[in-house]
């Protein structure tokens, strides 16, 4: 009798998954699929119960915190902190130490720059992101709201010369600032003197000009573009007076942009079925083998995309060299709370998906460890989300060691990025870094998930401030400062990335340029952006500001953050004085955000997309956005700031808004007027069951209704 699986050791392995590992992943590697699954079985046997026990500990701690708040309506900060220490929520400080991570690529340890995050499920998006290592500054200025799209500057017709001239003016201003000329401006350049040994420009007044800092000149590209270097970032100046529509001879400026890219299996991806998960692994395999490609139709034309080749240059001494044409990629695995039935135990129970991710993405990375194209240092970079405290970090480090042994990989090849996005990790960040000290290459902050956990952890304590006002609370600024100061205290300077969160408005590039410099000023060596265009524009910040110099100042001041502020819960001020109008605005905003994201997740399997908010501004949303919005509504409902009836009305009203926002999509399935589709049910359940959802995570409900949708469709 045929089955859909085969038994290997103590596992039931889905047949299509076995075939994928056997015929695709192991092809070209010195390991067989049977050996791989036998090793996976042994690792699951060793770590599965540990995974379960760590999740039990989360529940136990949350239960104790809930009880404490129910019995302590007025919070004494000292007593509260002592309580958290007594129950093991806060762990002992590990003392002074420095991380000992080795074999880290320069993109992580030596270069500050933008970082993209891209769902692994979409080949086209993955290729766009990884190929965004270099980007045209002219295109990004001309095509975005950095230059207002109105009056004589409109983009309503091709090659608006006034807009082109303004684009070139902005680019020349940028060059004058970051690579200045002696007694001249880039506006005056007509051409470059064809000489390799030094950089000399012809000016429109007949004179010559050179760089104030001649060491910034690195060489020439194969087609004669000028390669400069500033703050460890490269840029190309394209001189071509014949093609230039501007009075100067500068045709374009090509910036090194997305230095690193996180290829995401987690919050921005939706992989409910086995086929979807295998598709995600296959895309990552294409990246590591360097043969990923995508073919699609745009405006009636067939377009094919593949990974960029390296860029070739000749240096000032006439020697040939190359620079990477692609981002260095990291891979984000799922958290330890996720499970899969693609590989089951013999009793048909699900296994931890995080363990499977660690094994499979590491197996796939063996292709790059042979080629040394992505990582020149022979490392593999795994970003691990949703870790709660040092015990879970240690568990992950032990797991990585076992994966290395199983796959015959050199010790400490698997590096880790730790997301500082859960409250227990924030309060124990130094201890978390200590547990990962020989592997850690990345820490970062993220407002959405971190606030979602802040709300859920203190759910019983009281009603929280309006979602957009929580950033004004003391805990949040301390959280952001603490991440940088603890990271530098532990020796991450020029060894590992310290990151900041996403700019969520992909169409608002002028606003991004005005606001995102604060991440660099805070000491962050990388910061998340939503698109290749945003990466190129954000790269201008890193040219203008030396992050490593700022980090040195922070280290020299040795100023500790006031960690007591981390315990200040962001309560709603004077809830009795909150007007009904403000309540309705808040719950409408949250309901619209939830519906706009969930309807695409359930009906289309899209884990990350640009969703219009209630004011029709496009926002990049993933499950982190959903977590904070659903937990905030659940909190207000629990504390009777609003009623169930008000929330039901908000969801129905906002479903009509979301339907109208998507009416031009021929594949969109409206939620109104019946309000009984799976997307609508999932959205409301996320709120009405929000208090019960472990840590406020949304996956269980999303997956349940996505499965129902797929079953109904089939």
Residue ranges and their predicted role:
Residues 26-31, 46-53, 67-74, 89-93, ...:
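Intrinsically disordered or highly flexible coil/loop and linker segments, enriched in small
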Residues 2-91, 99:
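N-terminal-proximal low-complexity accessory segments that begin disordered
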Residues 16, 20, 24, 39, ...:
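Generic, well-ordered alpha-helical scaffold segments in large soluble proteins
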Residues 12, 16, 20, 31, ...:
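Generic recognition of stable, solvent-exposed alpha-helical segments in well-folded globular domains
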Residues 81-85, 89-139, 143, 147-148, ...:
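Acidic, glycine-enriched catalytic cores built around paired aspartates
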Residues 2-3, 82, 88-395, 402-409, ...:
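Catalytic alpha/beta active-site cores
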């Amino acid at each position: 009798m045929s089955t859909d699986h085969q038994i290997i050791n103590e596992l039931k392995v889905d047949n299509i998954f076995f075939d994928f590992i056997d015929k695709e992943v192991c092809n070209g590697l010195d390991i067989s699929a049977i050996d791989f699954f036998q090793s996976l079985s042994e690792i699951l046997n060793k770590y599965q119960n540990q995974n379960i026990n760590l999740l039990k500990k989360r529940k136990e701690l949350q239960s104790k915190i809930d009880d404490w708040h129910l019995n302590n309506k007025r919070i004494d900060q000292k007593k509260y902190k002592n309580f958290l220490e007594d129950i093991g929520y806060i762990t002992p400080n590990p003392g002074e130490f420095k991380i000992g991570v080795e074999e880290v690529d320069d993109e992580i340890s030596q270069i500050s720059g933008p970082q993209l995050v891209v769902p692994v499920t979409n080949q086209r998006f993955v290729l766009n992101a990884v190929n965004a290592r270099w980007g045209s500054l002219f295109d990004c200025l001309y095509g975005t709201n950095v230059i207002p799209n109105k009056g004589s500057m409109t983009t309503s017709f091709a090659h608006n010369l006034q807009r082109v001239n303004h684009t070139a003016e902005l680019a020349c201003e940028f060059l004058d600032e970051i690579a200045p000329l002696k007694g001249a401006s880039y506006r005056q350049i007509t051409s470059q003197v064809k000489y390799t040994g030094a950089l000399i420009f012809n000016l429109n007044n007949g004179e010559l000009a050179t760089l104030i800092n001649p060491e910034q000149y690195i060489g020439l590209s194969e087609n004669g573009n000028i390669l400069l270097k500033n703050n460890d970032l490269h840029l190309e100046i394209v001189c071509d007076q014949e093609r230039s529509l501007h009075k100067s001879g500068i045709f374009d400026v090509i910036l090194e942009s997305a230095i690193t890219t996180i290829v995401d299996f987690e919050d921005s991806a939706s992989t409910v079925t086995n086929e979807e998960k295998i598709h995600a692994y296959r895309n990552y395999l294409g990246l590591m083998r360097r043969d990923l490609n995508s073919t699609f139709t745009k405006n009636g034309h067939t377009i094919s995309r593949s990974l960029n080749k390296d860029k070739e240059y000749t240096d000032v001494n006439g020697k040939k060299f190359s620079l990477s044409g692609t981002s260095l990629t990291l891979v984000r695995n799922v958290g330890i709370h996720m499970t899969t039935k693609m590989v089951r135990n013999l009793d048909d129970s699900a296994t931890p998906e995080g363990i499977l991710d660690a094994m499979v993405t590491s197996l796939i990375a063996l292709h790059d460890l042979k080629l040394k194209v992505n990582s020149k240092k022979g490392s593999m970079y795994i970003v691990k989300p949703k870790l709660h405290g040092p015990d879970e970090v240690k568990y992950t480090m032990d797991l990585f060691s076992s994966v290395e042994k199983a796959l015959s990989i050199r010790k400490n090849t698997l590096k880790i990025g730790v997301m500082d996005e859960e409250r227990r990790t924030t309060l124990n960040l130094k201890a978390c870094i200590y547990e990962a000290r020989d592997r850690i290459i990345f820490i970062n902050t993220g407002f959405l998930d971190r606030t979602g956990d802040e709300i859920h952890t203190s759910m019983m304590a009281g009603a929280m401030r309006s979602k957009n006002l929580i950033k004004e609370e003391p805990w949040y600024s301390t959280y952001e400062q603490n991440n940088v100061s603890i990271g530098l205290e532990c020796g991450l300077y020029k060894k590992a990335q310290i990151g900041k969160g996403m700019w969520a408005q992909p169409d608002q590039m002028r606003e991004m340029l005005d606001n995102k410099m604060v991440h660099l000023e805070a000491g962050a060596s990388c910061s998340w952006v939503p698109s290749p265009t945003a990466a190129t524009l954000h790269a201008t910040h890193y040219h203008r500001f030396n992050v490593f110099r700022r980090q040195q100042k922070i280290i020299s001041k040795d100023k500790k953050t006031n960690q007591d502020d981390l315990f200040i819960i962001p309560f709603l001020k004077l809830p009795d004085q909150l007007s009904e109008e403000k309540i309705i605005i808040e719950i409408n905003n949250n309901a619209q955000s939830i519906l706009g994201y969930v309807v695409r997740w359930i009906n289309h399997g899209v884990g990350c997309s640009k969703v219009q908010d209630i004011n029709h501004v496009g926002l990049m949303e993933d499950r982190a956005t959903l977590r904070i919005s659903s937990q905030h509504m659940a909190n207000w409902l629990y504390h009777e700031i609003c009623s169930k009836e008000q929330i039901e009305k908000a969801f129905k009203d906002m479903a009509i808004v979301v339907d109208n926002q998507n009416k031009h999509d021929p594949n969109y399935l409206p939620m109104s007027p019946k309000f009984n589709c799976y997307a609508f049910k999932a959205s409301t359940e996320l709120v009405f069951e929000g208090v019960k959802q472990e840590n406020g995570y949304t996956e269980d409900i999303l997956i349940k209704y996505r499965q129902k949708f797929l079953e109904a469709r089939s």
